[in-house]
Amino acid sequence: MNSRLFRFDFDRTHFGDHGLESSTISCPADTLYSALCVEALRMGGQQLLGELVACSTLRLTDLLPYVGPDYLVPKPLHSVRSDGSSMQKKLAKKIGFLPAAQLGSFLDGTADLKELAARQTKIGVHAVSAKAAIHNGKKDADPYRVGYFRFELDAGLWLLATGSESELGLLTRLLKGISALGGERTSGFGAFNLTESEAPAALTPTVDAASLMTLTTSLPTDDELEAALAGATYRLVKRSGFVASSTYADMPLRKRDIYKFAAGSVFSRPFQGGILDVSLGGNHPVYSYARPLFLALPESAA
């Protein structure tokens, strides 16, 4: 299996669809895929977009945080051995991401939860910026607030992709053409510098393990759903928003709402997922990425 690891050096980002005043740290793979579709159309029209959608073995993780040399993954939605103290429970709740190499110690209850909780602040900080919107025909600007995440200097987001060499080559080409990701890009959010890096062994994806944690906001196909749910522990996230296309309709229209499994969900059986069409009556399909990459949880946690 061919793979490439990309590091996105962001300053400020606005990710998530829960309103302007909130923002998440990570970026779901479907948000990135939408940007890839837009860039493919810009670079090569419908032909290049068709090539991207036809990449049947291309798999993406969500964009997840790194701090220095450490690549962080979502806290698994899995039972954790604990002494049951209220302090341990409070510390565990503060942990959103942890180094992939520490998954085993976290799940078997030997990790330093205080250190892992403190590590969250090394990613960056949430903040709110005051803005003003000026509308035609109005003298006064309407104030509004935008939530964003500011990364520390040695922190950012990483993406792992697997696929054929030609698929990874197309992905790299498109990524290099994108200037910013997420919302409020005209306000300076989401700009990044892109570099490639060597993927550590702790991030090796697999489908061969008793417990598989998805690194991607994803969804099984209808035929896979029942089997995937057996023994799974998961969180559902609503994916929605407006279509970013000037040719889709004469006015901004929303995508079809869909619920997916959040990254960090744990399954005993892998699934393939797919590329969904979430259009609602517009002039062309609107593609939503829902294929997972899985990471094996240590056997002692299975």
UniProtKB/Swiss-Prot annotation:
Alphabetical list of Pfam families matching this protein: Csm4_C
This protein's record includes keyword RNA-binding: yes
Keywords: Antiviral defense, RNA-binding
InterPro entries: Csm4, Csm4_C
GO annotation (BP), single: defense response to virus
Phenotype of the disrupted gene, per the record: Deletion of the entire CRISPR-Cas locus (cas6 to cas2, Rv2824c to Rv2816c) decreases resistance to plasmids encoding spacer elements about 6-fold.
UniProt entry tagged with the keyword RNA-binding: yes
CDD domains: Csm4_III-A
GO molecular function: RNA binding
Quaternary context: Part of the Csm effector complex that includes Cas10, Csm2, Csm3, Csm4 and Csm5.
Other facts noted in the record for this chain: Encoded in a type III-A CRISPR locus.
Function: CRISPR (clustered regularly interspaced short palindromic repeat) is an adaptive immune system that provides protection against mobile genetic elements (viruses, transposable elements and conjugative plasmids). CRISPR clusters contain spacers, sequences complementary to antecedent mobile elements, and target invading nucleic acids. CRISPR clusters are transcribed and processed into CRISPR RNA (crRNA). The subunit probably binds to the 5' handle of the crRNA, helping in discrimination between self- and non-self.
Record family assignment: Belongs to the CRISPR-associated Csm4 family.
Protein name: CRISPR system Cms protein Csm4
Biological source species: Mycobacterium tuberculosis (strain ATCC 25618 / H37Rv)
